[in-house]
Amino acid sequence: HLFESRFDAMRAAYKGVWEPILASGSTVSISLLILLFSQLSSTASLGPIGAIGIVCSMITILTLLPALLLLFGRWIFWPRKPEFDGDDHVMSGTWSKVGRVIEKNPRRAWIISGTFLLLLASAAPTLKADGIGTIDTFTGNPESVVGQKLLETHFPGGQGDPTQIVVAADKIDAVTAAVKNAPGVTEVSPLLDGFVIPGQPLPKVKIVDNKAIINVTLNKAPDSVEAGEDIPKIRELARSADSTALVGGTSAVYFDVRTANGRDNRTIIPISLFVITLILGLLLRSILSAVLLLGTVILSFFATLGVCALVFNHIFGFAGGDNGFPLFAFIFLVALGIDYNIFLMTRVREESQKMGTRPGVIKGLTVTGAVITSA
């Protein structure tokens, strides 16, 4: 609308967008790369893959897209092709009205929105994201789930998939005696070198490289959170009898994965917050503004967890969720939320330098509101 020449329009637009695009892309890329600190290869590998994708997107947006827009001209915006008239049309529309409402009652606006988000965030602690068994991942009752429930009804839950302890051959009896009374244990027996045939002598214990395996049957489903809670005590007792004992099997693997996810939540999230604060501080030239913006995004993150808790746990009644969910939700929600803040605040700063803080904020909101909403 403001420029008759599409080249002049592109020059003005490019000057205004390259900095926030680089800043937002860098923020998301660095946030994803922080996943490399994860103890799980499945999580760590996602970091560089996602970061490479973001960098490629930035290159495309800053090079290929402008070239295509210049090549094809205004008709590419059909059916609402912009025509040159010299007027600034951005101060009209829905977001202009929203901006005027906020301008009239700024205190009421932030109190209402902040209170609403806090109410949603208050439900976040009720979110069940401490792990979930395989049978609980189904919303229906397939044959495998029916079979597992039948097994748990008539036999120990871990009958078909025992926990295994690798021990020194001369420590079999000591370890067996140590773990047989552990919580959740229903049966302990060494792995035999052959099949048990009625009326025939029992096969010898299978020993390989002076190591033997002891099968420990638990009374709960092997992939359940409850079975995993028994693993630390079993490990403690086994190692009290054999310091080289190693406890493995499905229950142990699931427990270790949940432990690693918990550690990732406690380390990666704070590192991400620190890095994002630095990037925002450099972009906005103000650490206070960066902390304020980060606070709004963190509040929206906890509000999102609260909504998830209300919907998944209290409305649909799901058994729970993977304990890696909070980390992935944080990385993507906070990274995207910071993106939107960068788009908004970059334009607000630009407009504030021209027309003052208050009208600059309203102009920035009006210009970026539709873009943020559609994104």
Where are the language model's segments positioned?
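Membrane-embedded transmembrane helical bundles of large multi-pass transporters/channels
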Residues: 1-129, 240-375
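Structured non-transmembrane domains adjacent to transmembrane bundles in polytopic membrane proteins
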Residues: 129-320, 342
